[in-house]
Amino acid sequence: MAGHDSGNAKRGRSPSFGVFVRKPVERASAKGTSDGAVDSQAIRIDAAQSWPDDAVEVGAVVDAYGLKGWVKLAAHAGAGRGGDALLKARDWWLQKGAERKFARVTQAKLHGDTVVAHPDGSVDRDTALALRGARVFVRRGDFPALAADEFYWVDLIGLDVVNEAGVALGKIADMIDNGVHSIMRVEYPATGKDGRPKTGERLIPFVGVYVKAVEQAAGRVVVDWEADY
C-alpha cells in the first residue's frame, strides 16, 4: 500500500512485489483443483515471449469470472498502491506448478476488491477455470511510473542503508506497512551473547524525517539514524 507518511515523507508503494508473503489464493480455489500445468488451450501462446529477467509476481488467478473466458484475480496490491501494474500491463506470464506460459491480456479492470481480466484465447468458463491457481507475473519495466518521491518496495529491497556519517547500518531485507507509513526492516551482521554470529535487525520508518536520500543508482538509502538506536 502507498505510504501515508507525515511531513516531507518519502513514499514506498507496497506490498513489495517480488518479496512478500503471497495471499493464500490456492485455498480460495475449488477443492480438487490440481497444481499442474496451465491448459495450453486456455491461453494463446507466443513462443517468442520467453520468461523476462525482470518478472515480478503481482497476483494470482483465483477463479473464473462469468462465461466468456474472463478470470478473477487476487492482486498483491490495490490500484493506486502498486496494483496498477496488474491492471495496466498487457503482457502476463503465468506459472502453475512447473509450467510457465505467456498470455496477452485484452482487458483488465477492477471488480469490487478484486481484478478481473480476459486473457486472449480464453474463450469460455472452462478455459478460464483451467487457469485457476496460476501465479501472475509482469515485467518490472511495465510498472506505471511513479512520482519522484515514490518508490516500489521491490526497488528498495537489497539496498544498503547508511547514516549521514557514512556508517553502514545494513541492507533492507523487507518493507513493512504499519497502516500509517512504511518501515524498512534492515538486517546487519551481529554477534550473539554466546559469541556466535547472528543477524541483527533494525526497524527504520520510511519517512522524510529519517530518510534523507534514496540513491538507487548508488544502491543505498541515506538515513538520519545512529547504529546504537
UniProtKB/Swiss-Prot annotation:
Please give the Gene Ontology molecular function terms for this protein.
Answer: ribosome binding
Q: Provide the Gene Ontology terms for cellular component.
A: cytoplasm; ribosome
Q: Kindly state which keywords UniProt assigns to this record, in alphabetical order.
A: Chaperone, Cytoplasm, Ribosome biogenesis, rRNA processing
Q: Which pairs of positions does the record mark as disulfide bonds?
A: none
Alphabetically, which GO biological process terms does the record hold? ribosomal small subunit biogenesis; rRNA processing
Signal peptide boundaries: none
What assembly does the database describe for this protein?
A: Binds ribosomal protein uS19.
**Which family does the UniProt entry place this protein in?**
Belongs to the RimM family.
Could you give the domain comment from the record? The PRC barrel domain binds ribosomal protein uS19.
NCBIfam families in UniProt: 16S_RimM
* Protein name as catalogued: Ribosome maturation factor RimM
**Which organism was this protein described from?**
Burkholderia pseudomallei (strain K96243)
